[in-house]
């Protein structure tokens, strides 16, 4: 995905065109016509021919200085179409002068293969470097300042490519980055959900920067943002989050890179006629490019410095360098730069990192965006193909839903796209008809021979991929969009990775796009999700397929799509499943949402953090002995191990179906923002390998700035939660069927009242600390009056944790009651909670304790027992001290808990 550069002549203004014409006319007076006509064929004596456009053609069309550049001056003309028409007349290989350069054009797969194999591949392993790149992207500061896309072929290029491919674009590294890629894709799809939702809510009056009318999405803008967010996250560590007043680093970078992209689309005179570089100076183009380069340099430098400061801070705190410093590609580069053998190690401005970053960002966005746009356009114009794609996608996810090993039927992952062969065929066919780069450009670094013709060093090569991929000698019905061709025995093995020369959308040879795997995976993931989750229609009927001139193929008319969400129907629990849940021996209660919930659940929080093998075995044993309710959370880091245990329990037949289980999870405060709630739930579902959860909760009545989950929270990260928007996002999760019920945790009466003032769906559950040592009488009364179930945690006082207390298990009152009834103190505490009408979540890992916990339902506490328990001193254990700050929304425990502490 290296940057492609537009280097044919396209006047930047009428002044430039006039100046060039005047220079050409004056030059024709002093330059002998014969000299010009023989200019290209003045090669060393050789037995080979020289590939020259016919003398008659040159005589009638060529101009001094500019050569045949004027043929490509037409703003409405497409260079690949013009070259294709010339190939029809002059054959699959011909050449002509463009300014002061020689240009060789090849248009058949045989000629292209000859260019990109053997010794010729080495000869054509360089690229022309236009003025914009040299001026803006640091390519004018010597070889140690070149980026991967522009550095001449040689040892330094191999070193840089190794760094980029091994640390960012290899299949092994992409596996490590998968969760980051999916997270950013989820964020972008959440915005599509919001567009559909708001369009419905406002009866067609919803308009944002990415919409042009009711329900109509400007897909070009959305895909551009998605591509930038994905590559920006894995390269620079950019985080998506709510916008603040001042422009963020991400916004500054976007502005600078967009300005640079504009200059990259221009064609300075000096790119084709270096001796006329003064024209670019005269028009101010060079000056403006330099100004843009300085701006971009400052932004990228600040981003790299941010990473350096983070690394120093992490080392000062004694953090794990592998975890903290290898979060993105810049971190990896900085680690490598500390090694003495990396080129440019002594360069204080670290220009190689800047160049690589810009290469990755620039090259990683356009190909994905353009190919997806053309693919969607073709699908909208060929509804029968779209219908067949829907059938494949729907069938795959129906099968996945029924699978006992993986019930994540509503969540698309990279493993899914491997099985969707028709989706893969659609993308191949789209790239065949509309390659993002219709002409692949190279520069010969040495003399070579192609097709029997002598090609001097310094010749520009234009490989007309567009023409080659529409060759009727190779493709049946080459102008027809027919993905099924890639399902046939003859062509199903044809690949786009540069080995099949009849299909080269990513180029070939040594300079083939290094990010093929990344681009294909991302395109297939996005296309699959669009087809699975949305109905798509063109608001104007037939989509216009006109492309812009240039070496990158953009649509002239942006693509607008009318999107309607294909709502996932909430999974309705069957009466049989409810009976199975109750027959386990644990009573059930009906929530305000109408869903049935066991009153006793197993907690999965472990103080060691991530879920362990011990925990997986404990969950399996819990299911075996009768537990049907399991509580987890993103912050517990136990979702994955719970998902593994559920899948294994289904395999072993411990439960008949997933519907027999009640699974609750909870986001963390860093995701308590309107645009991150659905993303967080989807990530939890992916970890759990489930289609839905039964209960999804907010953890506290506060938000934190988006970032990693940690208890070491800087005071400046604590912010007030916007109850209205965050709860609306929770409601949308329930409406979409990703959760059956929604609830909160650690909310006081006052904060519940504030939340419900704007809620359409009231919280079904409030999960809070509750035990005989902290009885929550006021909160219980309020929740009962509002049909909110209190779900108790820390029922045993969190004994054994750093914040825990022996107030429950060490209580003399409870010990006496337990002794009198022949029960344990834990059983007495749990029975008391149950008799208050609350559900409870208790963590136990041994089989003995698991069975003991279940034996609380066939006996009762007396009135006298309740009176004695009511006299136990009260004290809160879970204080949430990390949310209290002099400058935050809660300046004291009293403000956080509203005097309920």
Swiss-Prot record:
Q: Name one GO biological process term.
A: morphine biosynthetic process
Q: What class of enzyme is it?
A: oxidoreductase
The cofactor(s) it depends on are: heme
Instruction: Give the GO molecular function terms.
Output: 1,2-dehydroreticulinium reductase (NADPH) activity; heme binding; iron ion binding; monooxygenase activity; oxidoreductase activity, acting on paired donors, with oxidation of a pair of donors resulting in the reduction of molecular oxygen to two molecules of water; oxidoreductase activity, acting on the CH-NH group of donors, NAD or NADP as acceptor; oxidoreductase activity, acting on the CH-OH group of donors, NAD or NADP as acceptor
Identify the residues that bind heme.
Answer: 513
Where do transmembrane segments lie in this chain?
A: 12-32
Known consequence of changing residue 550 to R?
In storr-3; accumulates (S)-reticuline but not 1,2-dehydroreticuline
Alphabetized, the UniProt keywords read: Alkaloid metabolism, Heme, Iron, Membrane, Metal-binding, Multifunctional enzyme, NADP, Oxidoreductase, Transmembrane, Transmembrane helix
Q: Does the keyword Oxidoreductase apply?
A: yes
Note the topology in the membrane. Answer: Single-pass membrane protein
- Provide the catalytic activity annotation: (R)-reticuline + NADP(+) = 1,2-dehydroreticuline + NADPH + H(+); (S)-reticuline + reduced [NADPH--hemoprotein reductase] + O2 = 1,2-dehydroreticuline + oxidized [NADPH--hemoprotein reductase] + 2 H2O + H(+)
**Record's subcellular location:** Membrane
Which CDD domains is this protein grouped with? Answer: AKR_AKR4A_4B (cd19124), CYP82 (cd20654)
Q: Which InterPro entries match?
A: AKR (IPR020471), AKR4A/B (IPR044497), Aldo/ket_reductase_CS (IPR018170), Cyt_P450 (IPR001128), Cyt_P450_CS (IPR017972), Cyt_P450_sf (IPR036396), NADP_OxRdtase_dom (IPR023210), NADP_OxRdtase_dom_sf (IPR036812)
E.C. number: 1.14.19.54, 1.5.1.27
Pathway involvement of the protein, from the record? Alkaloid biosynthesis; morphine biosynthesis
Q: Which purpose does this protein serve, as stated in its record?
A: Bifunctional protein involved in the biosynthesis of morphinan-type benzylisoquinoline alkaloids. Required for the isomerization of (S)- to (R)-reticuline. The cytochrome P450 module is responsible for the conversion of (S)-reticuline to 1,2-dehydroreticuline while the oxidoreductase module converts 1,2-dehydroreticuline to (R)-reticuline.
Would you tell me the protein name for this molecule? Bifunctional protein STORR
Q: Which organism is it from?
A: Papaver somniferum
């Amino acid at each position: 995905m290296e940057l492609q550069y537009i280097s044919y002549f396209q006047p930047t203004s009428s002044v430039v065109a006039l100046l060039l014409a005047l220079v050409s006319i004056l030059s024709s007076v002093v330059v002998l016509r014969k000299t010009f006509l023989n200019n290209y064929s003045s090669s060393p004596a050789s037995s080979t021919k020289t590939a020259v456009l016919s003398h008659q053609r040159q005589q009638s069309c060529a101009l001094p200085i500019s050569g045949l550049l004027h043929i490509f001056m037409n703003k409405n003309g497409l260079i690949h179409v013009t070259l294709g028409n010339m190939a029809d007349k002059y054959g699959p290989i011909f050449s002509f002068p463009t300014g002061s350069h020689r240009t060789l054009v090849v248009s058949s797969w045989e000629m292209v293969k000859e260019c990109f194999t053997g010794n010729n591949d080495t000869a054509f392993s360089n690229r022309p470097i236009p003025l914009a790149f040299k001026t803006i992207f640091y390519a004018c500061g010597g070889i140690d300042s070149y980026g991967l896309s522009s550095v001449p072929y040689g040892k330094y290029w191999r070193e840089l490519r190794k760094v980029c491919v091994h640390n960012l674009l290899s299949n092994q590294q992409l596996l490590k980055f998968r969760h980051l890629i999916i997270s950013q894709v989820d964020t972008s799809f959440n915005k599509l959900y919001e567009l559909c939702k708001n369009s419905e809510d406002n009866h067609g009056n919803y308009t944002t920067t990415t919409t042009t009318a009711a329900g109509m999405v400007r897909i070009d803008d959305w895909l551009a943002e998605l591509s930038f967010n994905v590559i920006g996250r894995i390269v620079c560590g950019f985080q998506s989050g709510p916008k603040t007043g001042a422009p963020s680093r991400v916004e500054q970078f976007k502005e600078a890179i967009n300005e640079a992209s504009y200059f990259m689309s221009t064609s300075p005179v000096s790119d084709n006629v270096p001796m006329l570089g003064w024209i670019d100076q005269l028009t101010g183009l060079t000056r403006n490019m330099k100004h843009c380069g300085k701006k971009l340099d400052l932004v990228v430098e600040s981003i790299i410095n941010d990473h350096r400061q983070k690394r120093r801070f992490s080392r000062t705190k004694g953090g794990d360098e592998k975890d903290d410093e290898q979060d993105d590609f810049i971190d990896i580069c900085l680690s490598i730069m500390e090694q003495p053998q990396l080129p440019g190690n002594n360069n204080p401005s670290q220009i190689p990192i800047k160049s690589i970053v810009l290469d990755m960002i620039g090259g990683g966005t356009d190909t994905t965006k353009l190919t997806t746009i053309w693919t969607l356009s073709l699908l909208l114009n060929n509804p029968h193909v779209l219908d067949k794609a829907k059938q494949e996608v729907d069938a795959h996810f129906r099968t996945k839903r029924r699978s006992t090993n993986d019930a994540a039927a509503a969540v698309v992952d990279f493993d899914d796209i491997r099985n969707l062969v028709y989706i893969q065929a659609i993308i191949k066919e789209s790239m065949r008809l509309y390659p993002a780069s219709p002409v692949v450009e190279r520069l010969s670094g040495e003399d070579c021979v192609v097709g029997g013709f002598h090609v001097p060093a310094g010749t520009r090569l234009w490989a007309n991929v567009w023409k080659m991929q529409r060759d009727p000698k190779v493709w049946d019905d080459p102008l027809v969009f027919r993905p099924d061709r890639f399902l046939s025995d003859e062509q199903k093995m044809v690949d786009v990775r540069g080995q099949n020369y009849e299909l080269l959308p990513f180029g070939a040879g040594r300079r083939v796009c290094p990010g093929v795997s990344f681009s294909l995976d991302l395109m297939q993931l996005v296309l699959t999700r669009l087809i699975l989750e949305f109905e798509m229609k063109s608001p104007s009927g037939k989509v216009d397929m006109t492309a812009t001139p240039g070496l990158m193929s953009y649509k002239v008319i942006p693509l607008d799509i009318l999107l309607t969400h294909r709502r996932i129907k909430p999974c309705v629990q069957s009466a049989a499943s409810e009976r199975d849940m109750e027959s386990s021996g644990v009573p059930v209660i009906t929530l305000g949402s109408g869903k049935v919930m066991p009153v006793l659940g197993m907690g999965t929080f472990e103080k060691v953090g991530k879920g362990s093998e011990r925990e997986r075995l404990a969950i399996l044993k819990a299911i075996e002995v009768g537990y049907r309710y399991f509580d987890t959370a993103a912050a517990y880091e136990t979702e994955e191990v719970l998902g593994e245990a559920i899948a294994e329990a289904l395999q072993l037949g411990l439960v008949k179906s997933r519907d027999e289980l009640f699974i609750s999870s909870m986001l963390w405060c860093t995701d308590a923002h309107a645009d991150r709630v659905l993303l967080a739930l989807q990530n939890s579902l992916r970890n759990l390998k489930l289609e839905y959860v039964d209960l999804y909760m907010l953890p506290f009545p506060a938000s934190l700035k988006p970032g990693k989950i940690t208890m070491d929270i800087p005071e400046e990260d604590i912010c007030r939660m916007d109850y209205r928007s965050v709860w609306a996002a929770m409601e949308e999760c329930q409406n979409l069927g990703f959760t059956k019920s929604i609830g909160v945790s650690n909310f006081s009466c006052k904060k519940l009242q504030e939340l419900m003032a704007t809620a359409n769906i009231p919280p079904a559950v409030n999960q809070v600390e509750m035990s005989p040592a902290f009885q929550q009488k006021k909160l219980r009364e309020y929740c009962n009056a509002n049909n909110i179930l209190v779900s108790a945690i820390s029922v045993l006082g969190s004994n054994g944790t750093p914040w825990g207390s022996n107030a429950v298990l060490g209580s003399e009152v409870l010990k006496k009651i337990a002794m009198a009834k022949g029960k344990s103190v834990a059983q007495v505490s749990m029975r008391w909670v149950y008799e208050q009408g609350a559900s409870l979540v208790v963590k136990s890992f041994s089989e003995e304790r698991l069975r003991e916990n279940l034996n609380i339902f066939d006996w009762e506490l007396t009135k006298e027992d309740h009176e004695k328990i009511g006299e136990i001193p009260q004290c809160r254990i879970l204080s949430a001290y990390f949310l209290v700050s002099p400058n935050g929304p809660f300046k004291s425990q009293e403000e956080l808990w509203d005097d309920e502490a």
